[in-house]
């Protein structure tokens, strides 16, 4: 899994970069 360690706000996985997913409970992208 490649997920840049950049705090990006998100509402959906498609808002995130590469293999990141949207962690909806915190509203930021991360690794599942």
Curated annotation (Swiss-Prot):
Name of the protein in question: Trypsin inhibitor 2b
Organism: Cucumis sativus (Cucumber)
PROSITE patterns attached to this UniProt entry: SQUASH_INHIBITOR
Family membership noted in the UniProt record: Belongs to the protease inhibitor I7 (squash-type serine protease inhibitor) family.
Feature type site, description Reactive bond: 5-6
Lineage, uppermost ranks: Eukaryota, Viridiplantae, Streptophyta, Embryophyta, Tracheophyta
CDD domains in the record: PlantTI
Matches recorded under InterPro entries: Prot_inh_squash (IPR000737), Proteinase_amylase_inhib_sf (IPR011052)
Task of the protein: Inhibits trypsin.
Primary location group: secreted
Gene Ontology MF, one: serine-type endopeptidase inhibitor activity
């Amino acid at each position: 899994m490649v997920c840049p360690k950049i705090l990006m706000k998100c509402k959906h996985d498609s808002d995130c970069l590469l293999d990141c997913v949207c962690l909806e409970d915190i509203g930021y992208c991360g690794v599942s």
